[in-house]
Amino acid sequence: MSIKRAQLGGTTKHIFVTGGVVSSLGKGLTAASLGNLLTARGLRVVMQKLDPYLNVDPGTMNPFQHGEVFVTDDGAETDLDIGHYERFLDINLGQSANVTTGQIYSNVIAKERRGEYLGDTVQVIPHITDEIKRRMRLQAQPGPDGDPAPDVIITEIGGTVGDIESQPFIESARQVRHELGRKNCFFVHVSLVPFMNASGEQKTKPTQHSVAALRSIGIQPDALVLRSDRPVSEPNKRKIALMCDVDEAAVVNAVDVPSIYDIPSMLHDQGLDAYIIDQLGLTQAADVDWAGWSRLLEAVHDPKHTVTIGLVGKYIDLPDAYLSVTEALCSGGFAHDAKVALKWIASDECQTADGAAAQLSDVDGICVPGGFGVRGIEGKLGALRFARENGIPALGLCLGLQCMVIEYARNEAGLAGASSSEFDPDTAFPVIATMAEQVDIIAGGDLGGTMRLGLYPAALAGGSIVAELYGAAEVSERHRHRYEVNKAYRAQIADAGLWFSGTSPDGHLVECVELPRDVHPFYVGTQAHPELRSRPNRAHPLFAGLIGAALDRQKASLLFDVAADA
């Protein structure tokens, strides 16, 4: 089924980003950087990631295999690249921004069961590719609130050219170009140029073969982004341009840089955005406005302070499992002209008081992020107790808040052995319990996409740290959880001194906890995932608050040392 011109959503252009040779080349960062540049030129840009796995979404995938699950405002569980897109473009994306093979096949099979194909033999071409094209063009329509259609849709195709799994997506992109016309589509291919230590030279052949594979399925790339650990020589760039039939001006080198936020300026300096604008006829594009991004880069490269934050987690062997958390912490540092030195701490190392002291004695603050399952929980409790008793600024996220409640219940509220029904169904004091609406879902075994997901409001108590940081009495944050603070124990825990400073507007769900400032300088937990709405040039208030408190502790420690020496 061809895309009809009347249904094109105006003059929306498509940029497709593919990858070759190896995975994890940085296609997502390349796509996000292009989006950043085009947005800085005044264009309306939306982003999309096509994932070739058969999972419907990454919500039930192992963090060690997939990395973090990025949740959007509308409750979609998506790929971590969606987080890059939101941070680089400073936009909020939705469910349509992430498409998986599992979603495509589920939709097609459901249509077949309903008889919508009128007895046709359902095949990859045209039925699967038609559904992919429909999803590709979904964001080309005007917004529900009257927002105009975007000028550009940038679509990253996951996987590596040549993989069986990604072939339907690449074929669909080829068909979109055929149906919309070559002046409305642009293909960027990201490829590796490896350096061979034995011969002391860079090799262009892998890129040539990767482009040949792409051309064999009907796509001639319009631009090449060459990934390398050192600059690609001009002769090699000219050779690649010749052998791959790409304009020399469209062959750019994305060399490893100190910060991911340097990538947009690196691509701009080589003229990639200008070339794309010219080829797509985006005459409405203005010059790049670097004002906001330049201030960010100054904070990145010229920090006035350095602060050490311990990230106490159970998935630290794969940092991508906490990608948005680490980016939010760094952004909190940018807001204070500070470099955040992350100390990765396996929560198991903090189970004992001595272990927690050994791991946390040299940090200025800690962050305890979300997670699932019982492994590592006692270590998180140990880390939080050490931070609470020693005045170390601490921020708990989702499970981190729940651990704050459990630790306080055990050690301050007289509820020895308190736990969560997630970890210990038989605990005498289930201070964290399954949400009422989740009980039947868990019993039914339907775990995919069934948590409390997406944007929910919270009412903040006047005079609280969280209300001060947000500068508002009510805020909305993204959530991803099945468990909540058990209302039956709230009064007893609050009487012991832990302040439930944020709740759902109806007062039913606990959204924030904290210790008063006269008890602890910064001990704050949130049931939400505020890291998902943080931006590099606009740090989230809770993360900025943590870094500010950590800097205050650091300065106080230095003053104490000076006084002691005197």
Swiss-Prot record:
GO CC terms: cytosol
Similarity-based family: Belongs to the CTP synthase family.
Entry keyword set: ATP-binding, Glutamine amidotransferase, Ligase, Magnesium, Metal-binding, Nucleotide-binding, Pyrimidine biosynthesis
Record: residues binding CTP: 23, 163-165, 203-208, 239
A single MF term (Gene Ontology): ATP binding
Protein's gene: pyrG
Binding-site list for ATP: 24-29, 81
Record-given protein name: CTP synthase
EC number: 6.3.4.2
